[in-house]
């Protein structure tokens, strides 16, 4: 059986990698071996950081809610507990948006939480 060289397949695979490496600095965008290493590393970073982004946004929302809660005389944990006791099902993303864009509505929720904490 004759030897089969993978010409078209190899070329296609290498073109795909170099296309993904577009915009990289130095040899990383032009040389296949270096580009392949960087593309693999970049894809790993992308996979990891798609999960990290969800954690980062949750942290940001909590920081914003805590700052607004303290302006209304509550800590973050007491605000969340009070809202839970009141049966308010507003998620952290919506609360953070209210804290930034509609302080009056957030203050009403904080007052509701205070009232339910004192029961």
Curated annotation (Swiss-Prot):
A GO molecular function annotation here is: rRNA binding
Task: List each coiled-coil range.
Answer: none
Keyword line:
Ribonucleoprotein, Ribosomal protein, RNA-binding, rRNA-binding
Any GO BP annotation: ribosomal large subunit assembly
GO cellular component entries: ribonucleoprotein complex; ribosome
Q: Which domain of life is it from?
A: Bacteria
NCBIfam families this protein is in? rplT_bact
What is this protein's function?
Binds directly to 23S ribosomal RNA and is necessary for the in vitro assembly process of the 50S ribosomal subunit. It is not involved in the protein synthesizing functions of that subunit.
Q: Which family does it belong to?
A: Belongs to the bacterial ribosomal protein bL20 family.
This protein's name: Large ribosomal subunit protein bL20
Per the record, the gene is rplT
